[in-house]
A protein has these predicted regions:
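Mobile genetic element proteins and their domesticated derivatives, centered on retroelements
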Residues: 1, 34, 57, 63, ...
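Charged alpha-helix within mobile-element recombinases
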Residues: 113, 119-181
Length: 181
């Protein structure tokens, strides 16, 4: 039918055209934050069977990076990470960009119906830092921190084993200081 012109021809889907990237003008203007699971293949000894989490923050202007390991993946850990980040970052922080994970926001949970904020969001508000949430299921919007997680897998987690949480924390701190900044 299409060949003889009776059925309408469906036009092809339009090609995806990315929006222009908003360049940051100074350090602290926007910082990307994300959480990564430490691969279980890296855990041996008393750490075997446990879960550890790597919180990462990258300044979009200077690419300055701060990493910290946590035993818990929660809004409390996110708040503690934020406090440590604010102390470690040499400039004032204007905006923090995160995904929509429950460790950062209640945006997509039933609890979001009441205007209750997570500990992380309360601390941001208290510190006067704007919270920008990326579009759901679009990790490329947090591309710098996602890329750093991939590089961590290739350079660090592929070659290291951890016997305890303290061992993981120390090695991660040493790796970040030596290899990234």
């Amino acid at each position: 039918m299409k060949r003889i012109g009776v059925a309408p021809v469906k036009p092809p889907n339009p090609k995806y055209v990315p929006k222009p990237y908003e360049q940051m003008l100074y350090p602290g203007q926007r910082i990307q934050i994300d959480v990564k699971f430490v691969p279980s293949a890296c855990l041996t000894g008393e750490a075997k069977g446990k879960r550890f989490y790597q919180y990462t923050a990258i300044d979009e202007f200077s690419r300055w990076r701060y990493v910290e390991a946590f035993e818990e993946h929660s809004t409390y850990s996110s708040m503690i990470f934020l406090l440590h980040l604010v102390q470690a970052f040499p400039m004032p922080i204007e905006c923090v960009q995160t995904d929509n994970g429950t460790e950062f926001t209640k945006r997509f949970t039933k609890a979001s119906l009441d205007e209750d904020l997570t500990l992380f969001e309360r601390k941001l508000k208290e510190l006067g830092i704007k919270h920008k949430k990326i579009r759901p299921f679009t990790p490329r919007h947090n591309g710098k921190v996602e890329r750093s997680h991939r590089k961590d897998n290739e350079r660090f987690y592929a070659t290291h084993c951890f016997f305890s949480f303290e061992d993981c924390r120390i090695q991660l701190k040493r790796y970040n200081y030596r290899d990234y900044n």
